[in-house]
Regions:
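N-terminal acidic leader/helix
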Residues: 1-22
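Metal-centered catalytic cores of metalloenzymes
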Residues: 3-6, 37, 48
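Short amphipathic alpha-helical/adjacent loop interface patches that line ligand
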Residues: 16, 41, 48
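Secondary-structure edge/capping motif, primarily at the C-terminal ends of alpha-helices
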Residues: 19, 23-27, 55-58, 62
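Short, surface-exposed loop/turn segments at secondary-structure junctions
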Residues: 27-35
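Short, charged, amphipathic alpha-helical segments
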Residues: 34-42
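Amphipathic alpha-helical coiled-coil segments
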Residues: 44-54
Length: 63
């Protein structure tokens, strides 16, 4: 079974790749892509918080 932290990080990576693609589209003038970039960045922020919580929980279980 894969570690929850690894799963969250892989999801963050996927979100980041999609955000980068949409950032390029936004730079070319597609304003809708800018909205998708902002949404992806919010998702990444939430995933980062989930990673911090999960790491803390796993650390506390060890001791």
């Amino acid at each position: 079974m894969e570690n929850e932290v690894i799963t969250l990080l892989k999801n963050m990576e996927q979100q980041f790749v999609e955000a980068a693609i949409n950032a390029e589209k936004f730079a070319e003038g597609n304003n809708s892509a800018g909205t998708r970039v902002r949404k992806a960045m919010q998702n990444i922020k939430n995933l980062a918080q989930a990673v911090r919580i999960e790491v803390q929980e796993q650390k506390n279980k060890q001791f």
